[in-house]
Design a protein with these regions (language model features):
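Catalytic palm active-site di-aspartate
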Residues: 363-367, 416-418, 440-458, 489-497, ...
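Polymerase palm active-site segment centered on the conserved acidic dipeptide of motif C
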Residues: 339-344, 363, 444-446, 454-523, ...
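Active-site palm subdomain of RNA-directed nucleic acid polymerases
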Residues: 423-468, 678-695, 914
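A short, polar/acidic, helix/strand-boundary loop motif
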Residues: 404-432, 634-673, 699, 708, ...
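Intrinsically disordered, low-complexity regulatory segments at domain boundaries
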Residues: 2-357, 373, 473-478
């Protein structure tokens, strides 16, 4: 086997000359060590990849970039589409689209353009799965491999101590926490040919804290300059320290609550000092004397309340340490659905002969992780805090408890929580540990900062987890026993539950957030009713975004618009207006009934091809019918049956456009409206199926993928679609198609000759195309709660199943004859079929008044006060029973709240009683 040069370290770009000199000296010591050379050779023999760096199998870009089973908006629209975005011929597009497999069937790990690091991790995980599933006694093999690594690490312990005593700065040598085995890190980096060749030196000499940070090379390269606009070294550190000292003292003594917070910070800091993670207490004068007035810069320590504890953080943003730091790494962290991804890899490796996949997974955590990787100088890891129990200095009069409270300082040999450099420094060490576990233990594991997930077969019990625990202890980054979660079918990783209980029999992994997290989120939403500041809104949006993304589809994301607007506001306001309260009510209902995300591990055993949908819309204000739309559906045949084609053309009811905010152009809203129309029209066709949906409008495509749109009108439609889709469980992949290649462009603009020719060009008998009556989402019920849409979808599917006697998701038995050539298909508007000319804002209002026959109805004042005016119009509405089950009905009298409507808090939310 070809050997790599023995050098384990490479100088940084424009490095410190002392760093280069020390690196060469350390390398000479390693080369002279027989134990080091033997460790490298043993590790090369244990490597399951044997140094191979072959390219991974191709994957579909855009699928699973953020989460498994979730389409990525950026990559899906233009990057490496299933059907090339440059196709301009309808026939060519249909032929290519109907041959495509759904990305969920072709992708396992989640393809995305993340460069060499992602490819390396994918290869390692795949190799670990293939090795472990092909071994006869993997439980014993984990124990053997773990013992080998422990022996190698023990053989290098003395060498690590010698290197540390000879080269490490004093604060690293004197640190009380367990040191990392740098000789072992250097040997494994060499043996496995890992790109982060400077890791051992950073752990030996300490990592740079601020300024121009060198690239770690643990991930792909990306230069990100600091926002400071000047060199960090040129900042007036002395002036900052003077101001911060006085400001901390003023804040700590201004109220009783501030003094209580200061006591909490002191207690947490004291526990770190007792654990040997910090050194203190120091006076400002001591540090000025040690480093010089401008030679150090302090960070303010503050308290952050969490679920069951108070965490202390150090404000590197306020002190401009982060703003003054340039980074050169594109940090990549695993997603919380890692266990589900591994389930797909195991299913792929085992295949149909397995007779069922039985997996378990566990989690581990490194306590005080950042504190255990050394910094190069404590001058910039100095923490300022108000010590409520500071001992009196000579000449000072103590208080009644014998203390003289004042500002004091604590120094850390490791990295503080809050620094940009802390994240890259520690994560590079954690990434190294994950590489070793995958290649030397054959464990399928990955880490999110200091949290690690380990997945394995149930037959192995917790053998891979025990091997991982021993490996981390050998490296010098031991896991915390208090946060150990033994491998089991159900476990939590990064706040998300991965449930394997249905994996063996059904091939399904369920991913969802815990009920405890949802309950806390509902409490936060309830508190927001009384007032919501921009800072609180930012925290709430972050929590909601995380929670909603782990439910099925993108349900609820559009309802975040008012909260996001408050979060982005620069004004100091907390008043909860009607839009905010409506959003809070909607999100509270969603969180209470949040559907779980289900991920198919073995896709479509029957080999069913996906359904294809093309949709389009048109808006011309001066036309006889200003707004029109249509869609074409292709349902591939099964069991020898013929393929089915479904078509629809539709004149948009005037009240639909009139219900939206006035603008000169409505094409964006209409494209979204007619993109979701197929699923409301024939939901039984899409139930439980994989779908490829082509749209010739990039903004509509992006909105449907992300589940969010800045335009309120569009956002309501998108939100209704994703909620409705929870009920029908369609796995929809949206993709862009050029207008010239979109067959749905023909029915939306009355181009019947072109439509018949397009059908005939792909061998479709026009007479067998089934024309359906378009059913739009009820425009006057778009603000209904999510569970109402879910109930409406389930009711529609149940009704369709009773009517046809067939399971949903299957083909229909009936097919309508096509209209005669050149004859326009019957286009029905359930809310009334009138034609109107919308030429101006005034004309639109007058036309709308004539169609709707608007009349104001005086209503009795609400018992709680405040009258309410209503206007009634012909339209559609979502009818809800008191129990929350909904059904879509078309009726006269869909109500809108008039300009004198009372505040939402004075009305009942969530249901419209039948």
């Amino acid at each position: 086997m070809e050997r790599r040069p023995t050098a384990s370290f490479e100088p940084m770009n424009d490095p410190d000359p002392r760093w280069v000199e020390t690196t060469r000296a350390v390398q000479r010591d390693l080369d002279r060590s027989a134990a080091y050379q033997l460790a490298v050779r043993e590790a090369e023999l244990e490597d399951i990849m044997k140094g191979r760096l072959e390219a991974p199998p191709p994957t579909q870009y855009g699928w699973g970039k953020g989460m498994l089973g979730v389409q990525d908006g950026g990559g899906a629209i233009m990057d490496a589409q299933l059907v090339d975005a440059t196709v301009e011929d309808v026939t060519q597009h249909i032929r290519e689209a109907t041959k495509c497999r759904h990305p969920a069937q072709t992708d396992t790990q989640g393809g995305d353009k993340e460069g060499d690091f992602k490819a390396r991790v994918t290869r390692e995980l795949r190799a670990a799965v293939e090795f472990s599933t092909g071994h006869e006694d993997m439980k014993g093999e984990f124990a053997r491999r773990s013992a080998v690594q422990q022996r190698i690490a023990a053989s290098l312990a003395d060498l690590s101590s010698e290197l540390r005593a000879k080269y490490s700065p004093q604060h690293v040598r004197c640190a009380y926490f367990e040191p990392i085995n740098v000789a072992y890190v250097a040997a494994m980096t060499n043996a496995l040919r890992l790109p982060d060749t400077d890791l051992a030196m950073r752990l030996l000499l300490g990592a740079k804290v601020a300024g121009d940070l060198p690239a770690t090379k643990a991930w792909d390269a990306r230069f990100k300059p600091g926002s400071l606009g000047m060199r960090f070294e040129d900042l007036p550190h002395g002036q900052w320290n003077e101001w911060l000292h006085g400001d901390i003292e003023r804040r700590a003594t201004r109220s009783g609550q501030a003094r209580e917070t200061a006591e909490i910070i002191r207690a947490r800091t004291a526990s770190e000092i007792d654990a040997g993670l910090s050194d203190g207490y120091w006076e400002k004068e001591d540090l000025d004397e040690r480093y010089g007035v401008n030679g150090w810069r302090a960070l303010r320590r503050f308290a952050v309340p969490q679920a069951d504890k108070i965490r202390v953080c150090d404000d590197a943003k306020e002190s401009l340490v982060n703003a003054g730091s340039n980074t050169r790494d594109k940090l990549r962290l695993v997603e919380a659905d890692f266990p589900a991804r591994m389930a797909k890899l195991y299913a792929e490796a085992i295949g149909e002969s397995s007779g069922g996949l039985d997996l378990i997974h566990g989690t581990e955590d490194i306590a005080a992780a950042y504190r255990k990787v050394p910094s190069d100088s404590m001058a910039f890891t100095t923490i300022a805090m108000y010590n409520t129990r500071a001992l009196p200095r000579p000449g000072e009069e103590p208080n009644g408890q014998g203390f003289c409270p004042r500002v004091q300082y604590v120094q850390m040999p490791g990295m503080p929580f809050g620094l940009t450099s802390s994240v890259t420094t520690f994560c590079s060490a954690a990434t190294f540990a994950a590489h070793c576990a995958r290649r030397l233990l054959a464990a399928t594991t990955e880490g999110f900062v200091d949290d690690f997930s380990i997945v394995g077969m149930a037959a192995w019990d917790d053998a891979p987890q025990r091997a991982m625990v021993k490996l981390m202890r050998a490296i010098g980054l031991p896991f915390s026993g208090e946060k150990h979660e033994r491998m089991a079918p159900i476990n939590v990783f990064c706040g998300v539950i991965s449930d394997f209980t249905r994996l063996r029999k059904e091939g399904i992994v369920m991913v969802y957030v815990s009920q405890k997290r949802k309950n806390k989120l509902r409490i936060d939403l309830e508190r927001a009713r009384s007032g919501l500041t921009p800072k609180a809104a930012r925290r709430l949006v972050g929590k909601l975004g995380f929670t909603l993304c782990w439910s099925f589809g993108r349900v609820g994301r559009a309802a975040l618009q008012p909260l996001q607007a408050r979060a982005d506001s620069d004004a100091d306001e907390s008043f909860v207006d009607w839009a905010l309260l409506r959003s809070i009510n909607f999100l509270s209902a969603i969180v209470a009934r949040l559907p779980r995300r289900t991920i198919k591990v073995e896709h479509d055993a029957e080999g069913r091809m996906p359904i294809c949908v093309w949709s389009d819309a048109r808006y011309e204000a001066d036309a006889e019918d200003p707004a029109e739309g249509g869609f074409i559906i292709y349902v591939p045949g099964e069991d020898g049956e013929e393929d089915e084609w479904i078509a629809c053309t539709h004149v948009t009811p005037t009240e639909v456009v009139g219900a939206w905010e006035y603008r000169k152009q409505y094409i964006g809203q209409l494209e979204i409206l007619y993109a979701v129309a197929p699923y409301f029209t024939v939901p039984e066709v899409f139930a439980g199926r994989e779908v490829l949906h082509f749209i010739d409008n990039t903004s509509a495509c992006a909105a449907l993928i992300k589940g969010y749109s800045r335009a309120i009108d569009s956002g309501l439609i998108v939100n209704a679609f994703h909620a409705f889709n929870v009920g029908i469980q369609a796995d929809v992949w949206f993709e862009y198609v050029r207008s010239k290649a979109n067959i749905a462009d023909f029915p939306s603009r009355d181009a019947w000759e072109e439509l018949w020719q397009a059908f005939e060009s792909v061998g479709v008998d026009n007479r067998k195309v089934r024309w359906v009556e378009c059913e739009l989402p009820p425009i006057f019920s778009l603000q209904a709660p999510a569970h109402a849409w879910i109930g409406a979808a389930e009711a529609r599917l149940e009704r369709a199943s009773r009517t046809t006697g067939r399971t949903t998701g299957s083909r229909s038995d009936s097919a309508r004859q096509r209209p005669e050539l050149k004859r326009r298909p019957r286009r029905v508007c359930r809310a009334g079929r009138q034609r109107h000319v919308l030429r101006s804002a005034l004309g639109a209002r007058r036309a709308l008044s004539r169609v709707r026959r608007i009349r104001w109805v005086a209503t009795r004042a609400d018992p709680k006060g405040g009258g309410c005016g209503k206007r009634r119009a012909t339209g559609t509405a979502l009818r809800l029973s008191p129990g929350g089950e909904g059904r879509v009905e078309h009726r006269t009298g869909a109500s809108h709240q008039g300009p004198h409507a009372q505040h939402p808090s004075q009305r009942t939310h969530g249901t419209v009683h039948s």
